[in-house]
Amino acid sequence: MKVGWNTIRFNFVDPSFIKDNSDCFGEYVSRECRIDIQKELIGDQLINTVLHEIIHAIVYNSSLNQDGGPLTDDKHEEQVVNSITNWLLNVFWENPWLIELLKKRSS
């Protein structure tokens, strides 16, 4: 998948809550241009997690989380990414015609 100039691949992984001491559903790994997603996710959790990590990739590739940027604090980045993801998905789900309009623009 292309995000800006980067090609990002998806990697569906087994979660390791004990090893990682984390309950995150996904993670953008910038150095490897990779998004890891827990492979047992389905439905809305999968959709939300994929878009959430894509937005993290956009934030990183836009330098918004670099020194001096508005999202240098990880907590702020997570709050912004989570809010944008949830609102954007709501817009798409409540307005399915919008997806069709966006697909027409790209063809």
Task: Describe every region a protein language model picked out.
Residues 1-45, 61-107:
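Metalloprotease/metallohydrolase-associated module, dominated by Zn2+-dependent proteases
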Residues 48-60:
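Active-site recognition of the HExxH zinc-binding catalytic motif
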